[in-house]
């Protein structure tokens, strides 16, 4: 009799850059869990079909990355409270009754990584660039840290305004046009995927000062294009999304397996692996 190994995956497009299989393989080894975790490309307009096929083939759970987080939100039969508020899902799990529950662990991953770097969020002036699913997923956890203000800006201003309106009852949040921002912020978070293409958001470099911390949700070998730009314009610190990735992955693993892996050791291994490429 052959024992079936539980299957997990990450869906995205592009997905070649993903380190999720590496992370979850290390998590499994660390916690003595038997599972397989793969990276899967889904067509830009074909996430639902790909996810249905995965779960029909006895997939247990999956992570979801750009550009499918809002598709996953609509795909799930049930949502956790934080996923419902985020309006985006980065983790899906097949329940015993066959239904699919959607969760969002991005915000927890981001906040824990910022705090790990000793970034002070309480009383800080925070700028979030981008107003897609990645941004919406982290706003409530950021507001829970009690910043003095949280500003959202986006290429399409109406999307930023919609997000600000959605969360206005949760804390001091405002939306601003990219072209009107000329002041510096304490914490600048780039939630767009521009760095994957070596591009920059159309916002003034005046957002950075010698007291600023830049955080790019994207990651790569060395500085991302956004963080390089931040450092060139005086930002004191610049962090990429690798720690956020490990943090949200640990939350996902906990949802799937009921065990919380240690993130610090895995992050060190991942950074070493990434820089060695």
From Swiss-Prot:
An annotated GO cellular component? cytosol
Q: Which Pfam families match?
A: SDH_C, Shikimate_DH, Shikimate_dh_N
Signal peptide residues are none
Catalytic residues (UniProt)? 69
What Gene3D superfamilies does the annotation carry? Leucine Dehydrogenase, chain A, domain 1, NAD(P)-binding Rossmann-like Domain
A GO BP entry: chorismate biosynthetic process
**E.C. number, please?**
1.1.1.25
Q: Name one GO molecular function term.
A: NADP binding
Q: Catalyzes what?
A: shikimate + NADP(+) = 3-dehydroshikimate + NADPH + H(+)
Annotated binding of NADP(+), by residue: 81, 130-134, 154-159, 217, 241
Q: Which CDD domains does the record match to this protein?
A: NAD_bind_Shikimate_DH
| Catalytic class of the enzyme | oxidoreductase
Pathway it works in:
Metabolic intermediate biosynthesis; chorismate biosynthesis; chorismate from D-erythrose 4-phosphate and phosphoenolpyruvate: step 4/7
Q: Where does shikimate bind?
A: 18-20, 65, 90, 106, 219
Per UniProt, the keywords (alphabetical) are: Amino-acid biosynthesis, Aromatic amino acid biosynthesis, NADP, Oxidoreductase
Its domain of life reads Bacteria
Keyword Ribosomal protein present in the record's keywords: the answer is no
Functionally, this protein is described as follows: Involved in the biosynthesis of the chorismate, which leads to the biosynthesis of aromatic amino acids. Catalyzes the reversible NADPH linked reduction of 3-dehydroshikimate (DHSA) to yield shikimate (SA).
Q: Which HAMAP family match?
A: Shikimate_DH_AroE
Protein family per UniProt: Belongs to the shikimate dehydrogenase family.
**How does this protein assemble?**
Homodimer.
What's the protein here called?
Shikimate dehydrogenase (NADP(+))
- From what organism does this protein derive? Vibrio campbellii (strain ATCC BAA-1116)
């Amino acid at each position: 009799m052959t024992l079936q190994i539980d299957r997990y995956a990450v869906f995205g497009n592009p997905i070649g850059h993903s380190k999720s299989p590496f992370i979850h393989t290390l998590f499994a080894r660390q916690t003595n869990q038997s599972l397989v975790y793969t990276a899967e490309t889904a067509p830009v307009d074909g996430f639902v079909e790909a996810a249905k096929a995965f779960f029909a083939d006895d997939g247990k759970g999956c992570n979801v990355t750009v550009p499918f987080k809002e598709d996953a939100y609509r795909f799930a039969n049930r949502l956790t409270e934080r996923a419902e508020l985020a309006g985006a899902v980065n983790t899906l799990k097949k329940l015993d009754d066959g239904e699919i529950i959607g969760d969002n662990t991005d915000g927890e991953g981001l906040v824990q990584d910022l705090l790990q770097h000793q970034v002070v969020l309480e009383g800080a002036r925070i700028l979030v660039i981008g107003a897609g699913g990645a941004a919406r997923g982290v706003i409530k956890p950021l507001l829970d840290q009690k910043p003095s203000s949280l500003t959202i800006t986006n290429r399409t201003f109406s999307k930023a305004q919609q997000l600000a309106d959605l969360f206005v009852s949760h804390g001091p949040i405002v939306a601003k046009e990219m072209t009107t921002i000329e002041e510096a912020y304490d914490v600048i978070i780039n939630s767009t995927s521009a760095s994957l293409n070596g591009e920059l958001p159309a916002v003034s470099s005046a957002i950075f000062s010698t007291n600023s911390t830049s955080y790019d949700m994207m990651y790569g070998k060395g500085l991302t294009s956004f963080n390089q730009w931040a450092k060139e314009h005086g930002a004191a610190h610049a962090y990429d999304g690798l720690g956020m990735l490990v943090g949200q992955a640990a939350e996902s693993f906990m949802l799937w397996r009921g065990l919380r892996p240690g993130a610090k050791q895995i992050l060190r291994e991942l950074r070493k692996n990434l820089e060695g490429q």
